[in-house]
Structures are given as structure tokens and as C-alpha cells.
Amino acid sequence: QFQAMLDIHTIVPFRVIRALAPSWREAAKKEAEAGDEVHRKIVNITSISGTMGNSGQANYSAAKAGVTGLTKTVAKEWGALKVNCNAVAFGYIETRLTASKDEANVMEIDGEKVQLGIPDQLRGMAAMLIPLGRPGTPEEAAGGVFFLCSPWSNYVHGQTLNITGGQ
């Protein structure tokens, strides 16, 4: 399971970025020759688990830490091409993975049914650790990604934006 977590959260973003490289480099060279400045955006998705760790999730935390390193490296390598590479690190966001375990979906992985969600007692404790007092919404999480994709973030580069409610 450790390798699967690395593959999903670290290797896949690397491969997507690598696939973009030829076309984005060529376009950037043409724009530079024409005197145009066009910013392209890469927004990787990570988690505060990648910087803070999370008990019982060494695989996930390691994979998300890898995304942060990938983001910073791509930012350094592609900055001259006007490719802004940033990441968003989510804290506790309400999703089916963080729903109450009693109400959560069941997912099948390799033929085994896995119940998703967090026990209510842990959900309550997690909310107490957030200074804003509640988990974030999917819309609030999307706002950070939207900002990093917008022209307002053209000078934001190689950064990880924490969407955590203050965790």
C-alpha cells in the first residue's frame, strides 16, 4: 500500500507535468521571441499531512511531502518559461473521506470493501484543533486553487498555499 500511495499522490503529478513539458516549453519560447509574457499555471494538490505528519498515515504523509518537493523543483526549473508552479495544502475539508463513518461511502479496493469516513469522536476532536472551529467546505478549498490559476497569482511562484482554517 505504501507504493500505491506514492504512485497516486507523487508519481502521477510528476508524469502529468512531464507530459506537458514539450508543448509548454515550445509555446513559451515562441512567446518570448515575440515579446509576449504568458503565464501558465500548475497547481499541485497536497495536504498539511505532508508537512505536519499524521499518525497512522506515514505513506500518505510521505507522498504529500513529495508533492511539495516536486512543486518547488518545477518552479525553479520552469520559472524562466513563465510557468507558475504552486501547490495547495488542504487541512480538514468536508468530503466523503471525512464524513461521519456511519454515513460514509464504501469503496472497493482490490476486491476488498473499505468503509470511508472518520468516527464521530475523532471528527469532534479534529474540529477543536481548527481555530475557525469547523472543517472547510469544498467551495472554500476550490477558492485557493482558483486563485492560483488566476492572473492575480502571476507573481506567486513555488509556494504552498495552506487551506486549513488556521491549523
What residue ranges belong to the model's regions?
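Residue(s) in the substrate-gating loop at a strand-loop-helix junction
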Residues: 47
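Substrate-binding pocket helix/loop in short-chain dehydrogenase/reductase
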Residues: 1-3, 126
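Active-site "substrate specificity/gating" loop of NAD(P)-dependent dehydrogenases
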Residues: 53-57, 79-80
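A glycine/serine/threonine-rich, flexible loop-to-helix segment
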Residues: 80, 92-129
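Active-site helix of classical SDR
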Residues: 17, 63, 71
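C-terminal substrate-recognition "lid" of short-chain dehydrogenase/reductases
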Residues: 134-163
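Short, small/polar-rich loop/turn modules that mediate ligand/substrate recognition or access, typified
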Residues: 79, 84, 156-158
